[in-house]
C-alpha cells in the first residue's frame, strides 16, 4: 500500500485537473488539428539535407498567419550562418530553441558567434514551426534525437562543437553535453532546469487524458516566431526534459565551461534553484552566471549581477524571453513590429497597454500601481551579456 499511494495521488490530481479544464472553449481551426504527416525525424547525413527536408515539410503543413509565406518559412526553418573570418573553420555551435518557439529565437545571438568565427546552425524541434497541435503526439525522444543527429553531423565535419539552448532547449543541450565529453562548452539562456510551478509533474499524467488546457482564440495567434498556446503534452515533454537534466547533473557535474543567464523575475523558471545548481554542479572555473535583478545571495565569484530595473527605458524587470534579443531587433526590439501587450490574464491590462503611449516593460504578470506594462522582449544589456558569454572559452 505504501508504494501505491503516491501514484494514486498523482492520478487523482490529474483527473481533478481534467475536471477543472473541461469547460474551456475549444475551437474548430487548423491550428488545433495535427498535420496529416509528421515532421521527418530520421537520421540525416548532412545539415543541408535536414534543412531542405524541414522546409519542404513546413511548406506543406504550416498554418500560415500572413500572406508572406516565404518570411514565415524563413523564421521557422533551421538556419546556418557561415563565419565571417576568412581562416578555416574549426569550431561550430548548435542552437536549440524553447517550447513553442522557433529557430529564429537565436537570430541575434547566432550572429555574434558567427562574427567570432563559429559555424552556426540551429534546429527545429519536432512539433514546432507548423501548428500548435503538432506538439500533441511528440515525445522527448523526438527532441533528443534531433539534437544528437545534428551534433553527430557537425562532429563528422571535423569541428569542435559547442551547444546553446533557450529554456527547454537549454535542458536538452545540457543533458546531451553532460553525456558527451567532446562538447566544448554550453551557452544557456533562461535554462528551465526547474519549473516555477509546484504541479508541473502532473502534466504527463494529464496529457494522457486531454490535449488542451487552453487553446485561445485563433485570431490571437499572430506571432510569426512562436506559438501563442501549447497543448498539455508540450508541457509534459518539457517536464521530462527538466527531470532528465536534473538527474544528469545529480549523477555527474558538468566540468567544461558553461555560460548561464537568468532573470530574477522569470515567470516560468525557478531561478533560485538554477543558481544553486550552477554553484554546485557547474564546476569549471571559467564558467559564468549572469543574474538580471536584485543582487543575488551567493558567494560564488563566477556570478555577475545586472540591475534589471532600468527607468530610463521604462523597464521594471526582465522577462523569460527578453534575454535573447537586441534592443534594435526588428520584431521584438524597443521599436519592434510586435509589442506584447498581452502580459497578464487580465483583459483590462491588455486594453490599457494598447491605449498607452508610453507603457512600461516587465516580466509576465508584473503589476505596479500607476503603471501600464507590456512584456519586455529585448535585453538592454545584450552586448555586455555576450561579452561574458564569449569570455568562457577562446578561439
Indicate residue ranges for each PLM-predicted region.
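C-terminal motif of bacterial Sec signal peptides marking the signal peptidase cleavage site
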Residues: 18-19
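Short, surface-exposed "cap/lid" segments of acyl-processing enzymes
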Residues: 74-125
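Serine-hydrolase catalytic core
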Residues: 83-86, 230-394
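Catalytic nucleophile-loop/oxyanion-hole region of alpha/beta-hydrolase
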Residues: 130-157, 162
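Gly/Ala-rich beta-loop-alpha elbow adjacent to hydrolase catalytic centers
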Residues: 165-169, 173
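Conserved hydrolase catalytic core segment
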Residues: 175-185
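Active-site nucleophile loop of the alpha/beta-hydrolase fold
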Residues: 188-198
Amino acid at each position: 500500500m505504501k508504494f501505491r499511494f503516491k501514484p494514486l495521488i498523482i492520478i487523482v490530481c490529474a483527473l481533478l485537473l481534467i475536471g477543472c479544464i473541461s469547460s474551456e472553449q475549444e475551437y474548430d481551426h487548423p491550428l488545433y488539428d495535427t498535420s496529416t504527416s509528421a515532421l521527418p525525424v530520421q537520421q540525416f547525413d548532412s545539415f543541408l539535407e535536414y534543412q531542405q527536408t524541414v522546409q519542404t515539410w513546413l511548406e506543406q503543413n504550416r498554418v500560415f498567419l500572413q500572406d508572406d509565406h516565404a518570411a514565415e518559412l524563413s523564421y521557422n526553418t533551421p538556419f546556418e550562418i557561415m563565419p565571417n573570418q576568412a581562416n578555416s573553420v574549426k569550431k561550430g555551435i548548435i542552437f536549440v530553441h524553447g517550447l513553442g518557439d522557433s529557430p529564429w529565437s537565436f537570430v541575434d545571438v547566432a550572429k555574434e558567434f558567427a562574427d567570432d568565427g563559429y559555424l552556426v546552425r540551429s534546429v527545429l524541434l519536432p512539433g514546432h514551426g507548423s501548428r500548435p497541435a503538432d506538439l500533441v503526439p511528440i515525445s522527448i525522444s523526438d527532441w533528443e534525437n534531433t539534437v544528437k543527429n545534428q551534433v553527430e553531423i557537425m562532429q563528422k565535419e571535423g569541428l569542435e562543437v559547442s551547444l546553446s539552448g533557450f529554456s527547454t532547449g537549454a535542458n536538452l543541450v545540457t543533458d546531451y553535453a553532460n553525456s558527451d565529453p567532446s562538447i566544448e562548452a554550453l551557452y544557456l539562456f533562461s535554462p528551465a532546469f526547474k519549473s516555477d510551478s509546484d504541479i508541473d509533474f502532473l502534466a504527463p499524467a494529464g496529457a494522457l487524458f486531454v490535449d488542451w488546457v487552453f487553446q485561445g482564440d485563433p485570431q490571437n495567434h499572430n506571432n510569426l516566431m512562436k506559438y501563442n498556446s501549447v497543448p498539455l503534452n508540450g508541457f509534459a515533454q518539457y517536464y521530462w526534459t527538466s527531470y532528465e537534466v536534473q538527474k544528469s547533473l545529480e549523477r555527474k557535474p558538468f566540468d567544461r565551461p558553461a555560460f548561464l543567464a537568468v532573470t530574477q523575475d522569470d515567470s516560468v523558471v525557478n531561478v533560485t534553484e538554477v543558481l544553486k545548481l550552477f554553484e554546485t554542479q557547474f564546476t569549471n572555473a571559467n564558467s559564468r552566471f549572469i543574474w538580471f535583478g536584485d543582487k543575488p545571495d551567493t558567494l560564488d565569484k563566477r556570478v555577475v549581477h545586472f540591475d534589471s530595473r532600468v527607468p530610463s527605458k521604462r523597464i521594471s524587470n526582465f522577462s523569460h524571453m527578453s534575454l535573447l534579443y537586441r534592443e534594435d531587433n526588428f520584431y521584438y526590439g524597443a521599436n519592434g513590429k510586435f509589442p506584447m501587450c498581452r502580459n497578464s490574464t487580465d483583459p483590462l491590462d491588455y486594453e490599457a497597454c494598447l491605449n498607452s503611449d508610453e507603457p512600461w516593460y516587465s516580466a509576465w504578470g508584473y503589476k505596479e500601481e500607476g503603471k501600464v506594462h507590456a512584456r519586455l522582449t529585448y535585453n538592454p544589456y545584450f552586448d555586455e551579456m555576450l561579452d561574458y558569454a564569449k569570455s568562457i572559452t577562446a578561439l
